[in-house]
A protein has these predicted regions:
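Walker A/P-loop NTP-binding motif of AAA+ ATPase domains
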Residues: 1-178
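C-terminal alpha-helical "lid" subdomain
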Residues: 156-240
């Protein structure tokens, strides 16, 4: 069985946000409860021998136990679980790296065993991995992936879809929004604004700049945009 779904791409492109919210859509469609189990990076432990393996095994044990209770003899589960591993390269980095610490290597083995246990039992669990560094993921984890999705920076239509409603509410017209879409496309290097650049930086900056009693003006928005830079391109390192 092929278990994990892997989402990769630059920071700020929505990988984690989608993973944390997709369960709501599934729950509504299937009329079941869906629970998110985020795997904390604390499972890497402090480096003591056997600690990472023990923590990862405990995380999978807890997930397996909860998922077993959701199985029904009718075949349709009473609920589902999303087992989310954000920054997955920190937990599943390639064992082909000659400089990899023994404890990290053992942790990858424990992770693979945990994924295989869930898959073999055909439990209602979706394992979702998010990473900025696809080449850093262990080949055995990649082979097990049911799907690998590439997340990139939003295009013109996508950026407009993100900013149109809030900017319209602030009094911007269509021509104003077109100009902001153009200015967030990036320069000659083609590095445009990410989703989080728009939602967590640009829009809040416009509001805070006008606080407490000034209107948000198009001319001022352009001034801010000329200073506000998009998240730099993520340069993915190759494993040793």
């Amino acid at each position: 069985s092929r278990m994990p779904v892997l989402l990769y791409g630059p920071p700020g492109t929505g990988k984690t946000a989608l993973s944390e919210t997709v369960g709501d859509a599934v729950a509504r469609q299937e009329q079941i409860g869906v629970t998110l189990y985020p795997l904390s990076l604390a499972t890497r432990g402090s480096g003591r021998v056997g600690e990472m393996t023990k923590l990862l095994s405990a995380a999978f044990d807890a997930t397996l136990s909860a998922a077993e209770k959701l199985k029904r003899s009718s075949g349709k589960a009473a609920g589902g679980i999303i087992f989310l591993v954000d920054e997955a390269d920190a937990v599943t980095q390639s064992r082909e790296n000659a400089q990899m610490h023994h404890e990290d290597r053992a942790g990858v083995n424990a992770f693979i065993r945990g994924v295989d246990r869930l898959a073999e039992k055909q439990l209602p669990v979706a394992v979702v991995l998010c990473t900025n560094r696809l080449t850093a993921i262990d080949p055995a984890v990649l082979r097990r992936a049911a799907e690998i999705f590439d997340f990139d920076r939003p295009g013109d239509k996508q950026r407009r879809a993100v900013i149109e409603a809030p900017l319209t509410e602030l009094g911007f017209n269509s021509a104003h929004i077109d100009e902001i879409v153009r200015l967030t496309a990036g320069g000659k290097d083609g590095v445009g604004f990410t989703f989080s650049d728009l939602t967590q930086r640009l829009l809040p900056t416009l509001i805070l700049d006008a606080y407490p009693d000034k209107p948000v003006r198009f001319e001022r928005a352009i001034e801010i945009l000329r200073v506000l830079k998009p998240t730099p391109r993520f340069r993915e390192g190759k494993p040793s």
